[in-house]
Amino acid sequence: MELRKLLPIFIIALVLMKTFLASAQDNIVTLAPLEVNAMRTNTQEKKLPSSVTIITREDIERTQASTVAEILQGALGVDVVETGGFGHLTSVFMRAAESNGVLATIDGVRANWGSAGQFDFGFIPTDNIERIEIIRGSQSTLWGSDAMAGVINIVTRKGKGLPTHSISMEAGSYDTYKESIHSSGTIKNYDYSFGVSRFDTEGFSTYSSWRGATERDAYDNTSLAFKLGRDIGSKKRLDFVGNWTQGNLNYDNATSDDTDFANDSHVHVALPFKMAVNERWDIKLTPSFAYRDSDTYIPGNYRNVDKSTTVDLQNNLYVTDDISLIFGGEYREQKAISYNSYTGSIENWSQYLTANYDYQNSESEYKNFLLTAGYRHDYHDHWGNHVTYKFGGGYYLPKTNTRFHTSYATAFISPTLDDLYSSSSNPNVTPETSKSFEFGLKQNLSERSNLNMTFFNDSRKDMIALDGNWIPQNSEKVYSRGLETELKLGLPKHFNLALSHTWNEHYDQDNRPLIRRAKNKIKATLTHTWEKKLDSLVGLYIRGRATDISSLKHTGGFTTVRAAFKYKYSNNLKLTLRAENLLDEEYEVVYANGTPGISGYAGFTYTFN
């Protein structure tokens, strides 16, 4: 879709804005400032010199998304690519970087696999998630490898107040059933959150039905999440965080069943300990462990096991009211066992330092000038030393309620264990590197309305790609630039409209676009709340044309429409109803891979103390 075709949409939106904003003031709701943990400190979103999106628990419940991948689809600057139906590998691209350039963390614990370097966002259900933080742009000075394009931090729910319990059930198309139980609260000196969920579906074919596929690929998923914490006095806190998920998927032929299958198990465990040394110095020690066991038969047994052990020691030092430091060190060991190919491991030691200067104008109640500088040194036992740095700044204009932000950063992605140790490995392959720049603004239009725009430009070199013999080589250069635009409007009568557009132009050294990444993506969401009882949502998602299979094939652009409703029948009972792909669009995100047609789901949530 060409940009000129989008111009009328933005013109109409801006004209309507002036009409609606004044009358919308009657519905003002003051919200608490949102904080972002993925920046290694509880920094308010409005102060960050980065492009950030926070998806809250309220957003998740309103959309009724079942997985993290579903809630991420259409998010600003994010491209979600599913390789088939329920349970198939789901990759996430940001700013045209490969999926191993997007770091996934669960409660601040790294979740990317050591073997392939990426994370499957379609594997994690949303039942026990409190919020999702999307930080676009390089974050390597804080997180090292895998954060070249950004970080997606999944924060699980934390208990508070009187123990509350809930039971949820949903059923719908493709013989799909979902059940979940959740309990959270505070008992004596402990706060806890516990959730378990089950998902079963007969699904649809991995191969596109409109290309002739008739069979169905069944899938089931069981997930358990647990968080237990205690404040030790007034200055210490200890938490235990555990997440376990197992999925079973049938791989079938296009027209008949067979015995192919894939079983995946994921475990993430962390034991963060926080201590306030004094009023200006906090310490956080986080040992964590991640495990993945993937067993595939298509035919023949292909089993892969990933293990990752990390110990992170972080210090937050508030030197003055205006100057703060984040510094520490991290040790990480990754192991992979491919039972038909290799066994390998790598170790990484790192030290990091980020300094923030938040200037207070004596003539203003606002801190309207922020400077930040970051440095990180990584030592990898296979390829040696690597240094990354980042400079950023933000400026706030109180008179116009406008905030500007900009940053320049370097980043890298380590070769994966597959690159270094598999049967077609290359022990001489080195890290991919990048340099990136971004500039953006956030204009508050009213209490419920704002406009966000960020321009970015990235250049990457030594990109790892397979040569003609399927051997990984540092051979490619990649260029990416784009504009991320989001407009949120608080309309009269409790309506809210959110419009977003991501334009991302990308190409390699031969001027070819990168595969499976659309140049244009548009999302529009209209929500309404009626007498605090009925929440309604109608969403439109447009994805442009994309290349596939080494630029030899293409997937066409498509438009999908969805709707979701939640009715508060009583203080204890909520009824839900949603419909997906209301236009029954026949489309593909990956060439020849199936996607769901028109479908509907209904359910309920019962809450009690």
Model-found features: residue ranges?
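Short, acidic, small-residue-rich periplasmic hinge/interaction motif at the N-terminus
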Residues: A24-E61, S99
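N-terminal periplasmic accessory domains that precede
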Residues: V68-I71, H88-F93, D120-P125, I134, ...
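Gram-negative outer-membrane beta-barrel transporters
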Residues: Y359-E365, F455-S459, N474-S550, K568, ...
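Short acidic/polar hinge/loop motifs at secondary-structure boundaries
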Residues: V109-R136
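Structural signature of Gram-negative outer-membrane beta-barrels, strongest in the C-terminal barrel
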Residues: G233, N278, T320-S324, Q334-A336, ...
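Outer-membrane beta-barrel signature, preferentially recognizing the C-terminal barrel domain
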Residues: S256-A276, N304, R403, S407-L491, ...
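Extracytoplasmic beta-strand/coil segments of soluble accessory domains associated
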Residues: A69-V109, W113, E130
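Periplasmic-side early beta-strands and strand-to-turn transitions of outer-membrane beta-barrels
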Residues: T141, N153, K160-L162, E170, ...
